[in-house]
Amino acid sequence: MVTMKDLLECGVHFGHQTRRWNPKTKKFIFGVRKNIHIIDLQKTLRYFRYTYNIVRDASAQGKSIMFVGTKKQANETLKEFAESIQVPYVNYRWLGGMLTNFSTIRKSVRKLEIIEEMENSGQIDLLTKKEKLMILRKKEKLDKYLGGVRHMKKIPDMIFVIDVAKEKIAVAEARKLHIPIVAPLDTNCDPDLVDYPIPGNDDAIRSIRLFCKEMSEAILEGRELMQEEIVHADENSEEIEYVSNEEKEEMLAEIQKEITQGAE
């Protein structure tokens, strides 16, 4: 789990310039240095550990967690960690309706799958050069926007967001659907929009990497706990005696007979 040394080395304590702050973050600010707000790392550490446990427990319950971070400093790091633990992610651009109009998103994902099937079967080679080029461009665009959510069959139970100020649409959709939001909370962000905030820098690459790493580890730890629980339950479960169709029919006949006799 994260330590104070980790936070200092990754520059998690550096907030934004004082003129860009959100007054609601005042309780998380330690002071000012050269017109930059310094975040109170004692509070960061406390919130970090609390949120780590929240994410771990959600994962242990089998809940799905989506990673969101589209800005330049975050997109590659976020993709790396999301793919390493096989969770859905959006790292290029948030398409409106990604959550609130999920059925349409699934249809777009299906288009991507159809194009891939055409490639694998060789069917795409039967098209004209122009048609093939257009379809391959379509595939490239769909994969760019939806590659991270192509295996997501339902909306996530929780989202982890890098920079809630930038990802306004994603945050608004999650809040509309009452999906809990986990996020680093920089000094320019609104704490009221985040269910599980972690006061800290959401711009520096090292800081972003630390947040992604810790949330990924929390998810993996939760999965391990869930697996242990399943194994433990299997060891203690009694052998189930299945009822045959004949026994079911016999039992239903007896019940029907009792009902008839009771009516008389």
Swiss-Prot record:
InterPro entries: Ribosomal_uS2 (IPR001865), Ribosomal_uS2_bac/mit/plastid (IPR005706), Ribosomal_uS2_CS (IPR018130), Ribosomal_uS2_flav_dom_sf (IPR023591). Keywords: Ribonucleoprotein, Ribosomal protein. One of its GO terms (biological process) is translation. Pfam families: Ribosomal_S2. One of its GO terms (cellular component) is cytosolic small ribosomal subunit. The keyword Transport does not apply. The keyword Ribonucleoprotein applies. Disulfide bonds: none annotated. One of its GO terms (molecular function) is structural constituent of ribosome. Belongs to the universal ribosomal protein uS2 family. This is Small ribosomal subunit protein uS2. It comes from Helicobacter pylori (strain Shi470).
